[in-house]
Amino acid sequence: MTDSTLHLLKAFFLGIVEGLTEFIPVSSTGHLIVIGDWINFASSSGKVFEVVIQFGSILAVMWIFRARLWQLIRGTLTGVRQEVNFTRNLLLAFLPAAVIGAIFIKSIKQVFYHPGVVAVTLVVGGFIMLWVERRAPHTPGDAPGAADDTASDERATAHTLEQISAKQALGVGVAQCVAMIPGVSRSGATIIGGMIAGIQRKTATEFSFFLAMPTMLGAAVYDLYRNIGLLSQHDMSAIAVGFVAAFLSALVVVRAVLRFVANHTYRVFAWYRIALGLVVAAWIYAK
């Protein structure tokens, strides 16, 4: 196998990893940092590679929600109250991360983008998820690990996207800021933050997916603008392969997650985070 072929296979694998982990609460950035280090993926345009494969994931979620997204845009422009309120909530949730990111993201990447940080945040985040899920009592008769689609969390005050308040949306936005630290997980922070704020699990997941569109798109465009000079002709094939892999795998994951959360809690992801964090810590110690 030639070095060029091996490089493309690594790019394809990382694209799959991005698509599989972007929309579940396990931290796609953390996985890319750790796995990229494990497989020794070297690219002169590494930052651009990560940004472009994230575009693949973004396009996947936009494609899946295209009908609802068009309804939201049309309703907002024509003054439909529910859609205007939903757009307001997305903006409120988007702004904290946009402001904090614009000011501190460079420092955050310099200080926190390291496998050791990922190991710690994976474990801590896993225990926080277990704690939040424990606070969400299930209806009698639920199977172990199952969650009722609309009434499993007795503390929830928002069971649909339209019922989310401005205060709850802002709380989700503040939680999203924490996800700038690798290993925390953007989807994990926004979903768990939403549940703490009183949003029902499945609704919090859907809101997280919609919030991902402006957040990830904005971050990707900003990073691409800042790092476009790093793009080399040699890496174009790897970037294209990673983009397609991320798009296709994200298509599968988003649909699967929506089905999963209708009948299950996030405990399995919490235990996965804890186990992976311990494995990463052991690997770092053994190096």
Swiss-Prot record:
What this protein is reported to do is described as:
Catalyzes the dephosphorylation of undecaprenyl diphosphate (UPP). Confers resistance to bacitracin.
Look up the domain of life of the source: Bacteria
Listed GO CC annotations: plasma membrane
Other remarks on this protein = Bacitracin is thought to be involved in the inhibition of peptidoglycan synthesis by sequestering undecaprenyl diphosphate, thereby reducing the pool of lipid carrier available.
Membrane-topology annotation of the record: Multi-pass membrane protein
Q: Name one GO biological process term.
A: response to antibiotic
Any one Gene Ontology molecular-function term assigned to this protein's record: undecaprenyl-diphosphatase activity
Q: InterPro entries, per this entry?
A: UppP
Q: Where in the cell is it found?
A: Cell inner membrane
What protein does this entry describe? Undecaprenyl-diphosphatase
Catalysed reactions, semicolon-separated = di-trans,octa-cis-undecaprenyl diphosphate + H2O = di-trans,octa-cis-undecaprenyl phosphate + phosphate + H(+)
- Write out the transmembrane intervals: 6-26, 45-65, 89-109, 111-131, 204-224, 238-258, 266-286
Entry's family note: Belongs to the UppP family.
Organism field: Bordetella parapertussis (strain 12822 / ATCC BAA-587 / NCTC 13253)
Principal subcellular localisation of the protein: membrane
NCBIfam families, alphabetically? PRK00281.1-2 (NF001389), PRK00281.1-4 (NF001390)
Cited PANTHER family: UNDECAPRENYL-DIPHOSPHATASE
Q: Which UniProt keywords apply?
A: Antibiotic resistance, Cell inner membrane, Cell membrane, Cell shape, Cell wall biogenesis/degradation, Hydrolase, Membrane, Peptidoglycan synthesis, Transmembrane, Transmembrane helix
Gene name linked to the record? uppP
EC number per UniProt: 3.6.1.27
